[in-house]
Amino acid sequence: MINVLTKKHFLILFFGSLYGSLAAQSYLGFNVDNDLYFGSDRYYSSGIFLEYGFHRKVKSDSTNKKHFISKHWTLGQEINTPSLHKTIDKKDMDFPYSGWLFLRFSKERYKNSDFGFGWGVTFGVSGAEASLAKKMQNTYHILVLNLEELSWSFSIPQAFHINAQTSFSSGIIIRQNIKFVQQSHLEFGTFRIGAKTKFGLQLGNLQGLPFFGYRLE
């Protein structure tokens, strides 16, 4: 891990992720997922994400109370491959090749440090060529891994997609310095439909939730 600290900026390079604070309440990130970290290359094979966001306190017009708002932008690419990715025979593939290039905006509003909700919208394009997935993956395989090109003989077709997302986050104090926290997501649209939730215990006296954007304050 490499840390470079100055008075107003910091930069962290760690396992393919690059993050830097642009101001007290904002972040810029470059994040890479790759299943070769785990010695395999199938299904969700690669993800590359350029991220920017910020959060700030704002006053409500009616009550003059402060609440938190965070906004996030992500430019990303995801690649999926079958487990037998060297075959060119469709009947031997358990999963199609898939490329997904997208731009996402999301906004979260926290009425207090332990209760928040959000929404988001994603625009993108699928397809081996349009998403640049085939070119990106084969270039990486040839130049970095010294492997043969993958066939991409059967892939999800090229199309423009729109997806929407909602989220809900909360925290409940169990006892001093122990809090039960959860965050739930729902996504629906023309490219992906799904739901997920995560929960756990937050230890310590730090206010807020671990899901509150990238905590750089």
Predicted feature residues:
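Short regulatory "switch" loops immediately downstream of catalytic or recognition motifs
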Residues: M1, F54-K59, G204-Q207
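Histidine/cysteine-enriched polar flanking segments
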Residues: N34-L36, S40-G47, I69, Q77, ...
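Outer-membrane pore/translocation modules
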Residues: W73-E217
